[in-house]
Amino acid sequence: MNLSPREKDKLLISMAAIVARRRLDRGVKLNHPEAIAIISDFILEGARDGRTVAELMQSGAQVLTRDQVMPGIPEMIHDIQVEATFPDGTKLVTVHEPIR
């Protein structure tokens, strides 16, 4: 399997999100990289499904709550930016204050 560096990055995000979701299912609070992975994966998959940038910017802030992450994590993450592939091309999606 020949993957480009971009495809490898997407695969790594996806795998990290899978691990983080398993931890959430067990009731474990997420750390910084796990929270970033879940939200980034949500954006990448939403773009693939045909959702708009505006929809993902709004819904990306509803993926995780403060109760699902370790103390201090929401204050550490002010913005998440993900380059996602939409049906009409690649666009940058920014989610402001993603954990509320």
Curated annotation (Swiss-Prot):
The record's section on InterPro entries has: Urease_gamma, Urease_gamma/gamma-beta_su, Urease_gamma_sf, Urease_subunit
Q: Which domain of life is it from?
A: Bacteria
User: Pathway, per Swiss-Prot/TrEMBL?
Assistant: Nitrogen metabolism; urea degradation; CO(2) and NH(3) from urea (urease route): step 1/1
Q: Which reaction does it catalyse?
A: urea + 2 H2O + H(+) = hydrogencarbonate + 2 NH4(+)
Keyword Iron: yes or no?
no
What Enzyme Commission number does this protein have? 3.5.1.5
Q: Which GO terms describe its molecular function?
A: nickel cation binding; urease activity
Q: Where in the cell is it found?
A: Cytoplasm
Q: Which UniProt keywords apply?
A: Cytoplasm, Hydrolase
In this UniProt entry, which cysteines form S-S bonds? none
**Gene3D superfamilies attached to this UniProt entry:** Urease, gamma-like subunit (3.30.280.10)
Q: Which BP terms does GO give this entry?
A: urea catabolic process
Recorded hits in PANTHER family, A to Z, give: UREASE
UniProt lists the family membership as follows:
Belongs to the urease gamma subunit family.
What does the record note on quaternary structure? Heterotrimer of UreA (gamma), UreB (beta) and UreC (alpha) subunits. Three heterotrimers associate to form the active enzyme.
Q: What is this protein called?
A: Urease subunit gamma
Which organism was this protein described from?
Bradyrhizobium diazoefficiens (strain JCM 10833 / BCRC 13528 / IAM 13628 / NBRC 14792 / USDA 110)
